[in-house]
């Protein structure tokens, strides 16, 4: 360095501290929030390590984490925090998020008496489900549908490409097949991560019990709950914590469950299995197509 040379300060790249969020409550009302991460942490009562897995600038595998007052979802383009009263979705420019936001607004409204927004008056189970479970159901249906559609899209492209390569072996046709196989390999990994999350949750009743946010809120006034046990709701690892599924449970029942019923997860388990099997079928389908590509 020359003696008279001035030192030029180097701008450090720091983690993003303020994100844009979309809040959707039980009435379907949407609100855009541009707030500091500490505001979000205080609002939903989660640790910094939990919020970190939603950082769009960092890579974290798919995760579904149950916490004391919230459920943290990192499902590809769907990055959300669900509480018993609202869902906070990280705003992004990903066009795949648009239909998911619309579905959240439609399905989370307490006035929506039928599944999927149909107001025929015959199906009222959605109104009786806890808010957090309706939100979880929307998120998991959205990601599973997205991955299934992507699988079909690649599968439809793969077979014609293989036929072209069989008829005429050219570098162009070979490159096309290689690109398709690469895309299928990435998709397989994405599908498997979701499948693994659901499977791990199914294997642990305590993890599934963590998902009843409304149940825990209802029991918060109990001396047994207020005695300091709430610390245990924060698992040590952000990736091993409670996993969540597409879940529905009657709100009235959840609000009146006693402490000795806290591990009653039969309804959650049945709903979780439905998503697990659907996702496993998708996993097998994309695997078959990948093997065909060689």
UniProtKB/Swiss-Prot annotation:
<dbReference type="GO" id="GO:0015095">
    <property type="term" value="F:magnesium ion transmembrane transporter activity"/>
</dbReference>
<dbReference type="Pfam" id="PF22099">
    <property type="entry name" value="MRS2-like"/>
</dbReference>
<feature type="coiled-coil region">
    <location>
        <begin position="179"/>
        <end position="216"/>
    </location>
</feature>
<comment type="similarity">
    <text>Belongs to the CorA metal ion transporter (MIT) (TC 1.A.35.5) family.</text>
</comment>
<protein>
    <recommendedName>
        <fullName>Putative inactive magnesium transporter MRS2-8</fullName>
    </recommendedName>
</protein>
<keyword id="KW-0175">Coiled coil</keyword>
<dbReference type="InterPro" id="IPR039204">
    <property type="entry name" value="MRS2-like"/>
</dbReference>
């Amino acid at each position: 360095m020359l003696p008279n040379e001035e030192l030029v300060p180097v701008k450090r790249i720091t983690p993003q501290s303020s994100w844009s969020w979309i809040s959707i409550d039980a009435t379907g009302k949407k609100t855009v929030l541009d707030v500091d991460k500490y505001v979000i942490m205080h609002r939903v009562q989660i640790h910094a390590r939990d919020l970190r897995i939603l950082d769009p600038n960092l890579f974290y595998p798919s995760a579904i984490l149950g916490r004391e007052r919230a459920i943290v979802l990192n499902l590809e383009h769907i990055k959300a925090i669900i509480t018993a009263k609202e869902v906070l979705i990280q705003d992004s420019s990903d066009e795949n998020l648009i239909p998911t936001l619309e579905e959240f607004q439609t399905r989370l409204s307490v006035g929506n008496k039928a599944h999927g927004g149909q107001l025929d008056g015959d199906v009222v189970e959605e109104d009786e489900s806890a808010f957090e479970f309706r939100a979880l159901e929307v998120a998991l249906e959205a990601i599973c549908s997205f991955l299934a559609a992507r699988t079909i899209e690649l599968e439809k492209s793969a077979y014609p490409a293989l036929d072209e390569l069989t008829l005429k072996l050219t570098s162009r046709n070979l490159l096309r097949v290689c690109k398709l196989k690469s895309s299928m390999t990435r998709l397989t990994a994405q599908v498997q991560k979701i499948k693994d999350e659901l499977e791990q949750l199914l294997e642990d009743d305590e993890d599934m019990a963590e998902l009843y946010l409304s149940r825990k809120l209802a029991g918060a006034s109990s001396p047994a709950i207020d005695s300091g046990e709430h610390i245990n709701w924060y698992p040590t690892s952000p990736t091993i914590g409670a996993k969540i599924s597409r879940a529905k449970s009657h709100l009235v029942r959840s609000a009146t469950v006693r402490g000795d019923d806290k591990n009653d997860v039969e309804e959650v388990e049945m709903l979780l299995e439905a998503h697990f099997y659907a996702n496993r079928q998708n996993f097998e389908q994309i695997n078959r197509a990948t093997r065909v590509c060689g």
